[in-house]
């Protein structure tokens, strides 16, 4: 379940966009990004590799197509899939449903269904701005029809908190810090609230993410480790 929440947070926010987007998302076809996820003890748990494989005009904006692969700490492939994001008039929009298909590990006997809103990163973001909320529903069932998982998550109180310097294995970046609250209601597994932060660097996108519980204890994080432009 923790892996699902980490992937959810990642794919909700980390999509790459073209030159027509705002300065924080001015990326290009062929760009490769590697991020490593860590547990609450800062031990590596997985590596996510993403590449911008296509970009094309659509409905007055730009569509970005992304290939992503998730590996465990031994380098074994856990999941792979393709996602997309769009940029229009400087706004970047990612469909939360991008997390569907093969991005969450599952077996052939399990059917996964994801429905949700679009996550918006407006043009000209600055400290003090409030950003639109979003919601997502994840359900999984066995081929027999038996329900396994039902998760309803809301992403609220999104705001641009501050400007901060972030050091990563891929370099040092001046970042816009965005915070939000993720409330996940999970049937049979109980509810969970996470206070999340993400750090956006100009021309790179997200370089760091942190997730904390309601008491302020770190639960997981992700950090940029490699960048190829």
Where does each model-flagged region fall?
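Bacterial Sec-dependent N-terminal signal peptides
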Residues: 1-21
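Acidic, serine/threonine-rich low-complexity disordered tracts
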Residues: 19-82, 140-229
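Hydrophobic/aromatic-rich structural module bridging two neighboring secondary-structure elements via a short loop
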Residues: 68-100, 107
